[in-house]
Amino acid sequence: PPPPPPELAVDTTNRPDKLVEKLEQLKPGGGGALYDAIYMACTRRSLMKGEPIEPRRVLIIMGDGTDTASEHTLEEVLELAQRNLVTIYGVSTVAYGFGSTGEANLIRLAEETGGRVEYPLEGVYKDITGYISKPSDEGNYAIKVGTGGYATELAKSLFESVAAIAGEITTQYILRYVPKNTDSPKAFRKL
């Protein structure tokens, strides 16, 4: 059976507890309609009270960039995000030493909308493979099985990646200009 269509779990909010609650309910799984989810995020968004008419829009994608079931294409969602001034950031779930067919899509989505991709799992798995290939008393016990250390390292890496993105978002400025050539007013122009 095809995967279910994307659903809006939490609309625009200034309550982080609502986001955390939904994030805790997420389950990892294979396959999905990433581009359809981006399309929905770019088109279905409520304004909050006191928010400017054209607020800053940021989308953080946590995953490997693979899309297996979308009705929309990568090109469609890129154009939509660019026209709606949506900056896309990625938090890659690809582990150190592994690849993903969707990784190029995640990079493209981020770079072509002014964002970037974080790789939180690289450091965790790099350290673990380092401990295995260069055994030492200290290294062998760095992430001890059954202690929760591994899960803690994963959570810490993911948190640090999202915090780095949040820090970058809060220290950016938006510049706009009115083009002289108005033949194609909806065309995205790169500065």
Question: Where does each model-flagged region fall?
Answer:
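Scaffold/interface architecture of coatomer-like assemblies
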Residues: 1-191
